[in-house]
Amino acid sequence: MRMNKRTLLFVSLVSAAFLGCQIFFGYRDLKSCQDLAEKQRAISEQILASTEQLSVVPWTASLEESESVNQYAIRLGNRLLLLTKGGSHPEVYSRGTYWSLIEQTSTFGGILVSLYGETGQEVLSKGSSVYLPNQRDAFPVLVAEFRSNQEPLVFLGEYKDGKIANKAGAIYGTSLVFLNTGNGFVPLGIYNSKEECVESLDLPMARAVVFADKENPTASGSYYMLSNEYMQIVVSQESGAIEGINLPFASDQEENKSIVNEIGFDRELAINSPSEASFPGVETIDSQRQNIANVVGGYYPLLRRGTLSDVKKRVPAQYQALNIVSGRELASPVATGFRVVSFDNKTLILESGDGGIRRTYSLGEQPYAFELEIQTTQGREDLWITSGVPEVEIMSNAFVPAVKYHAVKKNKSDLFNVKLPKAKDSLLVRNNATPQWILNSNGYFGVILTPRIPIPAGYASSFIPGNVVPTRLSQLPPKDQAYPASKYPGYTAMLPLPKEAGRYQFMVYAGPLADPTLKALDRANANSKGETPEYVDAIAFRGFFSFITEPFAALLFVIMKFFKFLTGSWGISIILLTIVLKLLLYPLNAWSIRSMRRMQKLSPYIQEIQQKYKREPKRAQMEIMALYKMNKVNPITGCLPLLIQIPFLIAMFDLLKSSFLLRGASFIPGWIDNLTAPDVLFSWETPIWFIGKEFHLLPILLGVVMFAQQKISAVKRSGPASDQQRQQEAMGTMMALLFTFMFYNFPSGLNIYWFSSMLLGVIQQWVTNKILDEKHLQHEVIINKKR
């Protein structure tokens, strides 16, 4: 019995302790839950206080019913959204107003979402949609969580991959999710907390939001085109941004004003991948609402268009030109789903589905330029306008993208280079300058954004993997091998927009970085004082020695333009330029040749001295220098003509990379079709290392001429060649081979220049050798008999 009492006492104490722990921890959990609920309620009230358009209101089925029955709705302006089960009411009462049922839709678990408003009131047009892909970066949303018999909690969450995340805690109740479009809130869908997914709502107010199909993300989109004699501008209805800018090729037709020449890549794509060389490239509508038929060739795509034959590989909307983006990586468009407000031959006006953003594209009279006006009805921070991603240009066998901006620093206006971001740090944002304009260039072409109104300080540039925005060159056979997409990443340039609502104008130049067009643009945009934006600075000489060669290149181009005016051919201009330079340098070259001939005549005597004083190298050197002095010979003089020509050679190289007018300029059709690219005598399918798929004849001719010059400049000898002579001959042969390989992939214009220079040098050498009779030259050699 005593044992039972002890056991009972022990059990009682343990039970009491357990109950005490339960009460203690339960109270603590309850207190924690109450604190969390109070915190969530405070956050909800704070958000609702700062959001005028959206509010939580009670409702009843009739005026007689009390509003204290804990039935709540979300009010969006002049609309009510209700969640009910078992049926809906044709009319409800809230805050002194009757609301009529517009439409209802059934969702998971038998929940009805009903839309109420004033009878006869217009609803959102079904033709305006906001397309949201299922996979994209997270973006902020507003969530109204309904809990049993409680006022809904409103908080900020994140939407990604169809799920909602709440940093303040888990989501337990059914929730309505709203998207802030910049002009208010639009229902994004209803959130099922058990399944953790968002379902779209089939309601007029929510039809503005469409979840795009992964397999066909742009199936619902249309494209509109503005065009003139300088460009085609293809605008996407889905994004409101520019899908493509296509520049027509120059032709002999009187109405054609383009200066863009067709090059080999254009012809090769039209033959091997016609779908990728079609223009406009997508199903496009003109101002007469007529479909525009695609044509193969005839245009240059300034912007990358991805793979036109594969919808999934087209350029994503966030990388299209003149889109407005935000977010951590500046890669989230702030509005999608636009409708046409007005469309004629010169102007296209688009408005987002919620009316928050209006875009106006206007063609002007200036070549390759147009105007963009952006109108926002509600302010928002961290908005940026993008330049788009220029197509790839191969300049002297190199890929040379560049982002630059023009600004005033230290009371001086200048053009500044932007360091291109890398894959690891794909976004570069700087706030240390206020660009007057920003340029995104591929070398020969560029997109220039010029704000017409003051904007915040700063600029940005982003790195985009080549597989995301593939270049058209990756379609050349063998596909993605000759020019693999991954090897050619894209870059965008961005300017910030003011955070206040208003109208913002930009002048956009999208075309060749050519002297005549940029000067015309400068004149058209000069202010009352005659000051210009200095767009012509966008033409920059490139290379490590550009600070030295730029004056030479400018001089060469002036002479070439003069000869082009006389002959009508850039190729002949290069040859005539070479002749002029040879005439200018003739006295120096003649003196150098004469000096070298003397050196060759002195060679036997030098060998005799070296043999005599081979044990006294210092004495031999003194005797040789005395021999040079008596005959007025300097060994270095033979190098002077070549040294003087080097700046002109490098200047010509820079000129061919910087002068757009030479791009696509033909000299001998079928062989030399582009002076800024290697000549092509014939080609084949399978690439060969170093040689590629094309046979370039000019570098080989250059090597032959250099070899001939070395043979002509050698002195005729009666006996066997000395070691020094054999060494000189071997060096000459090696130089000819070296220049052949070095110049093999150089532009044909540079090869024409150097080949012409070498050929004229051979002729001058041969003539000089004839004039300088060997007997007379031998008498000019003075020997020190006393040595």
UniProtKB/Swiss-Prot annotation:
Membrane disposition: Multi-pass membrane protein
Keyword set includes Zinc: no
Keyword Ubl conjugation attributed: no
Signal sequence, start to end: 1-20
Lipidation (S-diacylglycerol cysteine): 21
Keywords of the record: Cell inner membrane, Cell membrane, Chaperone, Lipoprotein, Membrane, Palmitate, Protein transport, Signal, Transmembrane, Transmembrane helix, Transport
Membrane-spanning parts: 170-190, 565-585, 636-656, 688-708, 735-755
InterPro entries per record: Membr_insert_YidC, YidC/ALB3/OXA1/COX18, YidC/Oxa/ALB_C, YidC_ALB_C
Covalent S-S links between cysteines: none
Molecular function in Gene Ontology: membrane insertase activity
One Gene Ontology term, aspect cellular component: plasma membrane
Entry's Gene Ontology BP terms: protein insertion into membrane; protein transport
Coiled-coil stretches: none
Lipidation (N-palmitoyl cysteine): 21
Annotated PROSITE patterns: PROKAR_LIPOPROTEIN (PS51257)
Function comment: Required for the insertion and/or proper folding and/or complex formation of integral membrane proteins into the membrane. Involved in integration of membrane proteins that insert both dependently and independently of the Sec translocase complex, as well as at least some lipoproteins. Aids folding of multispanning membrane proteins.
Family, similarity comment: Belongs to the OXA1/ALB3/YidC family. Type 1 subfamily.
PANTHER family listed in its UniProt record: CYTOCHROME C OXIDASE ASSEMBLY PROTEIN COX18, MITOCHONDRIAL, OXA1
Subunit comment: Interacts with the Sec translocase complex via SecD. Specifically interacts with transmembrane segments of nascent integral membrane proteins during membrane integration.
Protein name, as recorded: Membrane protein insertase YidC
Organism: Chlamydia trachomatis serovar D (strain ATCC VR-885 / DSM 19411 / UW-3/Cx)
